Regions:
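Structured non-transmembrane domains adjacent to transmembrane bundles in polytopic membrane proteins
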Residues: 54-76, 83-176, 402-583, 591, ...
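A general boundary/transition motif marking the beginning of the first structured unit of a protein
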Residues: 5, 53, 87, 326, ...
């Protein structure tokens, strides 16, 4: 046996993983059980907010107003509907006053006011224009958990019929509490959808039920472990309930990606006659390196969200980093231990044979030939495919040029949700209602004349409809400014800047929905270049370590970004502009929440790099083996095209299951990421990457001398570490000279369509 083909002996990490496989699995089972206990009840400790910048002026003003003037920040509403009567009917007035007094006596409730007890200047804002509805407004105190507990305690006794009125519950506390409940319910349903469908697809990919169960096991371990991590983090910081959706999606999706890659390589080694232990050793030295490398690239993309101040984004970074690293750890520790124990039995329970009924199974040669023909066609017409696919992606992304950013409000909820119905009634029938305007907090001593002069000054601003106040308490006061038009339209956002620029003899700070939006946009715009730079620089470095090329990392960043254009265009066209809203079952708010594009970019870019690493590692391996650029690109696509497509389809299924959520942001995240991974796998990896690499030719692999030496010392590749006599001394070589074919008996192969691993 030559040095190149000599099987590696288990050692180091491989020995650690495989020396006692039963013990490894037992320890993993115990740790998983502990994670279940540690992560139990995590959903109840997660928040449903986090879109605002905690260091912004609007956040400071909101907290100060809640502390000094709780009635200025109503977050709990009772909508009283008098039916055919009016809200001024004596019987309605009596019942409304009784409910107002009762609510004012509730523990944890302050700042209670109502139409029936308000002063003449404020009363019209609490009465519907048609006279049949009116509001009781209040402020529930405490953090999100305390507010939720108060709401659970008092809401049931107010909801429903009370004499001549029907009462419904709304306000920010009700919206967020209902959103949290719906997300938890939808996540459970998504898991019930995704798990069986994923299992069926895995059986189609692997053929063997035993092999198909391995990725699911890895995914479940990663999800349970991440829930425990999130539960621990809630002791130190705020964590968003939305992060649980990413935990499920990436836990299943990446675990399946990594398991596909490792099991495929393991079966290939078995097909060459290697013993299970030797096959695992080679698998960890080759595919294992690529899996670890891929996990690092995905984790870096997700870690970029830690740069932003909003805990909504930071929560996805916490969950994403944890689930990616746990999925990789499980794939590199538990999966090899299971493969050592299973050996050739990994192909047991071949369920596809039940449906063949005498038909001949497709061989790897037949399956791989389809990808080989596709690769040959793409490279023969490289300029056409490069221009055409780029043009298609750019056109699909054009709607994003019309993006409008807004805030997350009750319109995230399904149309029948009680708190959404109440807020919609308020928007439609209560001009100047509480929470629809801007508040100006004034701090510092001032005379009545100074307050009056300031009020007249801001009342003269072009975007102002009305100014109420001031309400003075000690050294503080506040004014309520009602803007013309919608609460968060361009006029309201310009007014925020004008109010902040207005001269005053005291310190002023502006808050309100439009102010929160302005501050959130500023925080994201200020930190976005840093996040993009972190992702780009680290990606360039990691891809260079993988390939040793200067050009390929640049191609990877540019093509990855290009692959996301379709996702962003679709998000605006569907969720902002409202196309397909009836079919998909959501209410379009006419804008995109400011943090969503950042979140979707980081997640989708990381997943694109995941597939990019799989493809590039194989192309690099072929180039090291043959020194022929065109052959390397063609064989790389031939050997990984089916694998990447299968992984993308399965991940898309999981994301679509998440996208069945009734909460619009979650639906947008799920369906948007599903589209992104499919476009990346089927267009960018299959068409655009090989076309561009064909056009760049051998220059693709160029690097200056110092960088070549750096890569030779620190580079990573999917090889077993042996030198290839066919290449220069500085190149690494694979232990294989070509793909492993099968004869339909369940042995492994590397290429094909959905059956790529069979």
């Amino acid at each position: 046996m030559t040095e190149v083909n000599k099987p590696p002996r288990p050692g180091g990490w491989t020995s650690f993983v495989t020396a006692r496989p039963r013990l490894s699995l037992l320890v993993a089972l115990v740790i998983t059980a502990l994670a279940v206990l540690a992560g139990s009840g995590v959903a109840d400790r997660l928040g449903s907010g986090g879109w605002e910048d905690p260091d912004a002026q609007s956040t400071y003003a909101t907290k100060a107003l809640e502390r000094e003037f709780p009635d200025s920040q109503p977050n709990f509403m009772l909508l009283l509907d008098a039916g055919r009567a009016t809200v001024d009917d004596p019987a309605v007035v009596a019942e409304a006053e009784r409910l107002t007094a009762r609510l004012a006596a509730e523990k944890g409730v302050t700042g209670v006011g109502s139409y029936w007890q308000a002063d003449p200047a404020q009363a019209p804002a609490l009465r519907a224009e048609d006279g049949h509805e009116a509001l009781i407004a209040a402020h529930i105190t405490g953090d999100e958990k305390a507010m939720g507990e108060t709401l659970d305690r008092i809401a049931p006794s107010y909801r429903g019929a009370h004499g001549p009125v029907e009462v419904r519950i709304g306000g920010l506390v009700a919206v967020r509490h209902e959103m949290q409940t719906i997300i938890q319910e939808d996540l459970t349903r998504a898991e019930l959808i995704a798990l069986p469908v994923t299992l069926v697809l895995l059986v189609m990919v692997f053929g063997s039920a035993v092999a198909a169960l391995l990725p699911l096991g890895i995914g479940i371990v990663a999800i349970l472990g991440t829930n425990a991590v999130l539960r621990g983090l809630t002791e130190f910081t705020d964590v968003s309930v939305f992060a649980m959706n990413l935990t499920t999606a990436l836990g299943l999706g990446l675990a399946i990606d990594y398991a596909l890659f490792i099991v495929r390589r393991f079966r290939e080694e078995l097909s060459t006659g290697a013993e299970p232990l030797t096959a695992v050793a080679t698998t960890l030295r080759t595919a294992g390196r690529t899996v670890l490398f891929s996990a690092l690239t995905v984790a870096v993309s997700l870690a970029a969200m830690l740069i932003f101040p909003q805990y909504f984004l930071r929560s996805f970074a916490y969950a994403g980093i944890a689930v990616v690293l746990l999925a990789a750890a499980a794939a590199l520790i538990l999966l090899p231990a299971a493969l050592v124990l299973l050996g050739h039995r990994v192909d047991s329970l071949d369920l596809r044979r039940l449906f063949r009924r005498g038909r001949t199974a497709r061989t790897s040669g037949e399956q791989g030939s389809a990808w080989a023909r596709a690769a040959t066609l793409v490279m023969r017409r490289a300029p056409v495919f490069a221009v055409a696919t780029t043009a298609v992606l750019i056109v699909l992304g054009l709607p994003f040029l019309g993006v409008k950013f807004g805030t997350a409000d009750d319109r995230q909820l399904p149309s029948g949700a009680e708190s959404h119905v109440v807020q919609q009634h308020i928007r439609d029938g209560f001009p100047g209602s509480p929470g629809g305007g801007l508040e100006v907090l004034a701090e510092g001593r001032a005379t009545p004349a100074q307050y009056t002069a300031y009020k007249e000054q801001i009342a003269g601003l072009p975007g102002v409809q009305r100014v109420d106040g001031p309400l003075v308490k000690g050294r503080s006061a506040y004014f309520t400014v009602l803007p013309k038009g919608e609460a968060v339209d361009d006029t309201a956002q310009r007014l925020v800047g004008e109010l902040r620029a207005a001269h005053a003899p005291f310190d002023t700070k502006v808050t309100g929905t439009a102010a929160v939006l302005v501050d959130s946009k500023h925080a994201i715009a200020e930190r976005l270049p840093w996040a993009a730079a972190v992702i780009a620089v680290v990606t360039l470095l990691l891809v260079f370590l993988l390939t040793g090329s200067v050009l390929i990392p640049i191609q990877a960043v540019v093509l990855n970004a290009l692959s996301l254009t379709a996702m962003f265009g679709a998000v605006v066209w569907v969720f902002q502009d409202g196309h397909l809203s009836g079919l998909l079952g959501f209410t379009s708010p006419g804008s995109i929440e400011t943090t969503l594009p950042v979140l979707m970019f980081c997640v989708a870019f990381g997943l694109s790099m995941d597939y990019g690493v799989f493809l590039l590692s194989r192309i690099k391996e072929e180039y090291d083996r043959t020194g022929d650029h065109n052959t390397a690109v063609r064989h790389g696509l031939q050997r990984t095209g089916g694998l990447i497509t299968a992984a993308a389809v399965i991940l898309a299924v999981v994301m679509v299951a998440i996208g069945t959520s009734r909460v619009t942001n979650t639906k947008m995240l799920g369906l948007g990421i599903a589209l992104a991974v499919l476009m990346d796998a089927m267009i960018v990896r299959s068409l655009l990457v090989p076309a561009v690499m064909k056009l760049t030719g051998r220059a693709t692999w160029w690097a200056p001398g110092p960088l070549k030496r750096f890569h030779q010392r620190f580079g990573v590749s999917e090889t077993d570490g042996e030198r290839n006599p066919l290449r220069g001394a500085g190149d690494r070589a694979t232990s294989h000279d070509g793909p492993a074919d099968i004869d339909g008996d369940g042995s492994a192969h590397e290429s094909g369509g959905v059956r790529a691993v069979r």
